[in-house]
Structure formats: C-alpha cells, structure tokens
Amino acid sequence: MAKNLVIVESPAKSKTIEKFLGRNYTVRASMGHLRDLPKSIFGVDVENGFQPKYINIRGKGELIKELKTAAKKADKVYIATDPDREGEAIGWHLAYILGLDPESSCRIEFHEITPGAVKEALKHPRKIDLDMVDAQQTRRIIDRIVGYQLSPLLWRKIRKGLSAGRVQTVAVKIICDREKEIANFVPQEYWTITARLRENDKAPVFDADVIKFNGKKLEINNAEEAAKTEASLKEAAYVVEKADKKERKRNPLPPYTTSSLQQDAVKKLNFSTKKTMLLAQQLYEGVNVGKGGAVGLITYMRTDSVRLSDVATAELRSFIGSTYGAEYVPAGVNVYSSKKNAQDAHEAIRPTSVERTPEAVAQYLTKDQLKLYTLIWKRTVACQMKAAVYDVTTLLIGAAGYQLRAGGAVLKFDGFLKLSDKKELAGEKEKEVPYLPEQTPLKLHKLMPAEQHFTEPPPHFTEATLVKELEEKGIGRPSTYSPTIQTILDRGYIVKDGKKLVSTELGELIVNMLTTYFKDIINIPFTANLETELDEIAEHEANKETVLENFYEPFSHLLQKADKEIETVEAPVEVSDVKCEKCGRMMVYKQGRYGKFLACPGFPECRNTKPILKKIGVKCPDCGGDIIERKTKTRKVFYGCSNYPECKFTSWDKPTEQHCPKCGHILYEKTDRNGNKKLFCTNENCEDAVKTYKGKAAANAKSK
C-alpha cells in the first residue's frame, strides 16, 4: 500500500496526478463536497452564533467509507482541493471526516496540474486556512438565510417553486433595469456630413467629417439644417488649419481572468459561460498528450488576477524571441494591474507551458477544447509582446466657419498583432490621410450626401456583458458568474433571445416585489459590500459572527414586515391556443429548467404536458411536413420534421424554402461569427455543393 494519500476534488484530476507521483502515492477524489447543510431543514442555529448544522451528503456514504479506510492505511494524508475558498472549505470538511487536525501541515496547494507544480506543493504543506473557511461559511450561511427564508415568501405570495438568491436576484434586477431603459428610450435624430477632399487634381482623396461651427460642436438635428450646412460647404474654400503626425502605440491586453475569458469566449467562439467553464475545467484537470501522458494544459481557471509568475514570463519572453524575433520582445516584462479585491495570490489563466502550442496539442483535443486553448494561448503570448505601433495623422480643416476633421492610421509595426488571424485583423482597417502643412489649400472633390441617424438605446445584456457588469459592480466572484446566469435562466426569470438576455414577466414581478420591500438588501451596493466583507474575513480583517449579525438583524425585520404587507398576487399565466386532448382545457405555457413547454392548467387532476413545436415556416423536403426547431439535451439547436418518428429528417443547419440554382436541392442557412447569414447546397453530387450564396446570389436562388 502507498505510504501517502493525496485527496483532490475530481477523478479526472486524480488520474492525472497519480501518474506524476509514482508508487508511494495514492490519489483519490472527494467528488466535490462531502458535507453540507441539510436540504430538508434550515440548518443554521441563529440563536447560537449562527452555527451551521452540517451533515454528510446523501449518497456519499460509501465514498466517505473508502476515503477513511485509505487514510487509516496511509502514513501521511495531503488535502489537495482547489486553491480557492470553496476548495479550502471542502478541505476543512475532509479533515473533519478523516479525523485530521486542520492545524497540522495537511494542506497542499497548486495552481497548475504539472509534475513540477504538484511535486513542489508536496514540499511545502501548510495548515488549512481557517479564515478562508470562515469566509466560505459566511457566504454559505447568508445564502441559506436568503434562500430558505425569502423563497417561502415568494411561495406564499406568488406561487410554489420560486426561489430568491442574494446574487441571482440582483443579476435579474440588472437585466430588468436595462429592459426598462430600452423601453423608455426616445430616439433623437441627428445628421452627419462628410466632405471628400484632395490637395489637387492628381493627389489622393480623403474624407473629413464636419465637427464644429464657429468653434462650437456642430449639432444637425433635421434635414433642413443638413441642407443649409451642405449649401454653405459647397461654396466654401477649404484650408488646413492644423496638422499633426505622431506614433500611437496599442498595447496588448492582460492575460485572462475568469471574467475576461468568459466574455471573449462568448464574443469570439459563441460559447456560453457554462460551456466555457466546463471546457476550461477539462483543460486544467489534464489531457493525455501522447508520450508525455496526461498533463494540465492551463492554470486554475477560477481567478480574478492578471499576474503571471516570474517563471512563466521568462518562458514566454524566450519563446517570443526564438519564434517571432528579438524585435517582438519588450525591454522589460509587461506588468498588468489586477482589479480591486482581486485574489492576487493566484495567477491569471495561462498555458502551463507555452511550448505546447495549439498546433502541437491539436490532435489530442476536441474541436471546442482546441478553440478555447488557442484563445488562452494566444492571449497569454500576446500579453508579453511589444505594442503595435501606428503612424497617426490628424488634419483639422477650416471652411466658412466650419471645422472638419480627417484622421488616418497606418500600421507601422505589428507587435502583438502578429498573433492575430485575418478575421481579427479585418476589423483593423487602415485609413491613410496625407500629412499636409498648415495653410495648405484643399479642393472639394465631392460633398457626400448628408446621412440621417438616430441615437440608439442601450443594448440588451448578453452573457458576456452581464459577466462584465457583475465584475465591474463587485457582485459575486469568478466561481459564481456562470452558475448565477444558469440559475436565473433555469428559473425562468430571464430567457435567451439569440444572444440577448431578456427578463420575463415572472422575473420582473419578483424583482419589483423584492426591491420594494428589501431595497436595502436586494441592491448592487449592498451585494458588492458583502463581497468586500467576505474578502475581509478571509484576510482576518473582519469577524464572521459580526458580519452575519449585521446582515441577519435588519433582514429578519424586513422579512416580517413584507410578510404582513405584501398582498398575494397571481403569477402571470400565458394561455396557448392548444387544447388539452385529455380534458379539453386550453393549455398554458410553463417555464421549466430546459425552457418553455405546454401544460394542462387542470394539474394535478390532469398531468398532460407537451413540448412547444417551433415551426420555421419551411416544409420537410422528405415528406412535406412542417420543419420544427428542436433542442438536444445539451441545448444545441437542430431541425427535424413534425411527423417524427414516421419521418426521420433532421439537420444541424437550418433548411430554407430556397433551392440551388444548379441542382434544385434545398439550400441550408448558416450564420457566421459576425452574424452574417449564408446559404449553401449540401447535395454531394452538385458542383456547387460547397458554394455559399449571399446577397444577390441568394436572392437569385430558385424558390419553390
């Protein structure tokens, strides 16, 4: 039997680590938490210092027995749970179950699953950090208080099955507030005018925008004002009033935190935050990379720090110099500042070895794992490269009291942009403007027609922008962003409309009720301040009991007041036009964990339910039935026939009513990352099978 037992959280991690350590070590997984507050009762003794009443989690008895047996046989037990508050608390519970002294050197911590990092951690075991455990327990107890005392209020006043949470309700409020802003937004009309100028008939033309009149910002509010401005500019003499030419540097972005990784994965890869964290977990816990065996490819993925270790920056600088050239290596290490309250003991998310390029590991990764790893690898390498340098030219031009501005930028040195692919650089359009001395007269080549615009409302939140908002407001921590969004989606408080997150009537009803009676608790400043207090507990700067008392006393008074004053309201019910075939009632729309479905309002007498068939207005090419949008268990959209199972037609791509001009086969629709829709033929025998149709080509494709 091995002399040493190492306990981690997941079996994937245990398999990877056991290969590093050899015969003298056995590695076992706790499978997450082993003890927790009971689900059936409140489980917190408020009258006795908020003592939690932990129990072993149901279904984990056999695992606990196995871990106890392994611990008794081992000379030394090392607790190697994740390097954050949740991991520290799991470690503390493990110590209790196994009879270990938390004050003994039983805890090891590493931020990457590589042989070097794990073996180095074993050389420096430490005590369990009881302050971090207190911080986690405080958060858990407050969330239990809110969940177990506020949720029943919603059951009594609205309907059973609803829930409220300290962070999730604030997240829903943020989305509801944005929806109100959008609904109340009044567009304002404005116009812009651009002049196309040149020095002489042989010189290149360039565009200049009208920005001022008589030294004040020009505001053109209607067509009449635009026409008047155009008339003046057509007759004006143009002259360069001021010319400026300088270099402008564009610095690389810092390495990824949890938040910035989730945001970029949504925008660039169209991954949900949940999917991003699942893939990141797989890359962190270990992937078999051939002869090298299983190894963690990235560092710990729950972090709000942008710090890189000295070893990592040295490796990056060496790699950049040998791969791209010395001219791409900055004189000193690029250092980035972490945000306030960041846990800077952690590193940013980075590859565990820059030498494991995306190309080198591609054959060992799934398609989505590779996409995410490439994103992380490129961002990390770029953050230690030199800035890109542009030559920027700015001209201020006078014309009959009007001032126009022409600006251009040309890339002089690509720097970190060397890592950008063609699609990324497509947004980096260069615009050349000639440098002309002051008082140079110019010719009006063409006055472009005035353009009408309207101010736009603030955009709907997406998963990416909501994560950014939560982080900027100090709400939650890296580990909570993704679960929070998933919870409010599952509860039906918000829905996804494409990429947009939109509040539902139910979400608005709950937010309005709770913010009316709990406005001092269900708000952004309070939630953010509580996160700061949890940080202070972890740093031994605040007391757990004091924080809990300061929260519970006002909360309990508000709860009593709300219970007396809130009138019972009916949750909004949307009636469908579908009749229940079992009892004849008109079925209603219900929100479940996996989206909307139809249910009979006669429940529990009638328990009939059925999925909502979302027709796309296209007939099945095989049988003539209706094509409907469906979803897999993992929420991926596909298209099938309403006559299933008689008709087995399915497609990942969206069928259309248009047909290939060459073979007459149905055309399918794809949407690229930029939201552009393209049509293509899938007939393998057609010479245009791989051709895409867009714009006029799509319009010319045959229809039935």
Each language-model region and where it sits:
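Intrinsically disordered, low-complexity regulatory segments
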Residues: M1-R140, Q149, I211, A227, ...
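Conserved short loop/turn motifs at secondary-structure junctions
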Residues: A2, D82-P83, R159-S163, K245-P254, ...
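Basic, low-complexity terminal or inter-domain segments flanking catalytic cores
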Residues: A2-N4, T16, Y25, S151, ...
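C-terminal or mid-to-C-terminal helical accessory/interaction module adjacent to the motor/catalytic core
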Residues: I113-A195, K246
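Core structural elements
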Residues: R139-Q149, V167, L197-E199, R248-S260, ...
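C-terminal accessory/connector segments of nucleic-acid motor ATPases
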Residues: F185-A208, V239-L279, L598
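Metal- or metallocofactor-binding catalytic centers and their adjacent structured scaffolds
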Residues: K217-P254
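Short acidic, hydrophobic short linear motifs in intrinsically disordered regions
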Residues: V240-A243, P252-A265, G292-M301, P457-E469
